[in-house]
Amino acid sequence: MRSDNTKKGDARAPNRSLLKAIGVTDSEMKKPFIAVVNSWTEFIPGHIHLDKVAEAVKAGIRNAGGVPFEFHTIGVCDGIAMGHEGMKYSLPSREAIEDTIEIMIQGQQMDGMVMVTSCDKITPGHLMAAGRVDIPAIVVTGGPMLPGFVDDKYTDLVSVFEGVGSCQSGAVSSEKLKQLEDLCCCGAGSCAGMFTANTMACMTEALGLSLPGCATAHAVDAKKMRMAKESGERIVEMVSEGLTARKIVTDKSFENAIRVDLAVGGSTNTTLHLPAIAHEFGLELPLEKFNELSKTTPHLIGLRPGGENFMIDFERAGGVQAIMKRLVTKLNLDEKTITGKTVGENIDEFVIVNPKTNARVITTIEEPLHEEGGIAVLKGNLAPDGSVVKQSAVHEKMLRHTGPARVFDSEEEAMETILKGDIKSGDVVVIRYEGPKGGPGMREMLSPTSAIAGMGLIDSVALITDGRFSGGTRGPCIGHISPEAYEGGPIGLIQEGDIIEIDMPERRLELKVSEEDLEKRRVLFKPVEKEATGYLSRYRKIVSSASKGAIRE
């Protein structure tokens, strides 16, 4: 066992003495040492219950003859960080989480680990660490929040964000906004739609690193606690088997995950996180792979924000395994999973408990919601290295759009103009200097996109940015434009009133300005330098382009 490096032989008597000081017995010294990597925090609804989930994991480890050791990681709530300087720290926290896990796992020489996680950048950080340290690893995601219920219908946090714009335009009252605020988020769990947190939970299951059914088992469901305990039991077996993370996850596993992502209409943040995770597994996942697979992967379920179903509907319809069963002819079925069985064997064992709900919520490949997957990668003279859009959440009439640029050098500038009502039908809002280096930190633009939606402009106004979006964003919103403005990308050359052409079916994003005029602008170009101190200052120096997953170089 790896942990014998800390506890076996006469030379390790001092090490054992310290372990005995924390209560480890002689008999336990002979057992596998299992880390329980817990991102529990009191800041985040998606994490508030993870202390209890971790206790269930530890019980499972003990049941199977292992010794659990729990430690914690940091976690930023994107929803609470939204719309202000705090959001600059969200994406950079991904690498900080990964680093701290590596330090603890390698420093203490753990035999295996169960990672208890939830929410947007935290789960990717855990997955990246799993690839880097390459020991037996299982991920237990915390599960979705139940939806709220307002005006006789289910709702979620995005309704509150969009309510801000609706209130500003006079469409709803301050009293109604307060009602939404009070009732849309009703307890523990990650936000109730197919936003980034739940998308990444689905990716984890599709990659084979969670037990089947884990992604959609809700935070308040006893099923989650049972799965946590089963994960604790299974990790001890995996240590005995020598089944490490890199023996499970391959290029083909990532293809499976991307197909699930495309079929469920997942968050565009997967185009950052999956390449970054692949990098830590020693693999390369080019952005173009999303386009390649999108052409042959239909969109099968209308989940918020790209539909009216919530995660509870998806869970009752069978969750990720139900989607994989629909996609069975397109998946790599021989890939291993943490169950010890293959993807195909797991699908064969999956039973549809609610056939009517399954048929209502999840379409067939023959009659999908959309022939193509949820995400498209656009390129052109405005995004030579690529940009991304959740096309499944765009109204058909806005798949192609041409309009004048309204240019802003920060989210705050754009938000002020939007809320004043100065954005008109047909406009293309440009928010730049929000990229990985330019922000720095690549903030999410959920506040401006939700304001546009709340003001009734979602089907007539586009927004493009070198920043990124929440998984809750809907509409013609194109992000991750690369190269970013800070690095001299064409988005930095746009002037007020320039015509921008968006063509999602053809995967094009064009600035309708002659190359001669653009060259004149390049000569005069000087990037905006936003102040950055501490961690963000270091991050700016080492982060790569969004087209490469914003990994560190």
Curated annotation (Swiss-Prot):
The modification N6-carboxylysine is found at K121. One of its GO terms (cellular component) is cytosol. The active site is at S470. The lineage of its organism: Archaea, Methanobacteriati, Methanobacteriota, Stenosarchaea group, Methanomicrobia. Its cofactor is [2Fe-2S] cluster; Mg(2+). This is Dihydroxy-acid dehydratase. The keyword Iron applies. Keywords: 2Fe-2S, Amino-acid biosynthesis, Branched-chain amino acid biosynthesis, Iron, Iron-sulfur, Lyase, Magnesium, Metal-binding. InterPro entries: Dihydro-acid_dehy_C, DihydroxyA_deHydtase, DiOHA_6PGluconate_deHydtase_CS, ILV_EDD_C, ILV_EDD_N, IlvD/EDD_N. Pathway: Amino-acid biosynthesis; L-isoleucine biosynthesis; L-isoleucine from 2-oxobutanoate: step 3/4; Amino-acid biosynthesis; L-valine biosynthesis; L-valine from pyruvate: step 3/4. Mg(2+) binds at D78, D120, K121, E444. Binds 1 [2Fe-2S] cluster per subunit. This cluster acts as a Lewis acid cofactor. It catalyses: (2R)-2,3-dihydroxy-3-methylbutanoate = 3-methyl-2-oxobutanoate + H2O; (2R,3R)-2,3-dihydroxy-3-methylpentanoate = (S)-3-methyl-2-oxopentanoate + H2O. PANTHER family: D-XYLONATE DEHYDRATASE, D-XYLONATE DEHYDRATASE YAGF-RELATED. GO terms for biological process: isoleucine biosynthetic process; L-valine biosynthetic process. It comes from Methanococcoides burtonii (strain DSM 6242 / NBRC 107633 / OCM 468 / ACE-M). [2Fe-2S] cluster binds at C119, C191. The keyword Isomerase does not apply. Its EC number is 4.2.1.9. GO terms for molecular function: 2 iron, 2 sulfur cluster binding; dihydroxy-acid dehydratase activity; magnesium ion binding. Homodimer. Belongs to the IlvD/Edd family. Functions in the biosynthesis of branched-chain amino acids. Catalyzes the dehydration of (2R,3R)-2,3-dihydroxy-3-methylpentanoate (2,3-dihydroxy-3-methylvalerate) into 2-oxo-3-methylpentanoate (2-oxo-3-methylvalerate) and of (2R)-2,3-dihydroxy-3-methylbutanoate (2,3-dihydroxyisovalerate) into 2-oxo-3-methylbutanoate (2-oxoisovalerate), the penultimate precursor to L-isoleucine and L-valine, respectively.
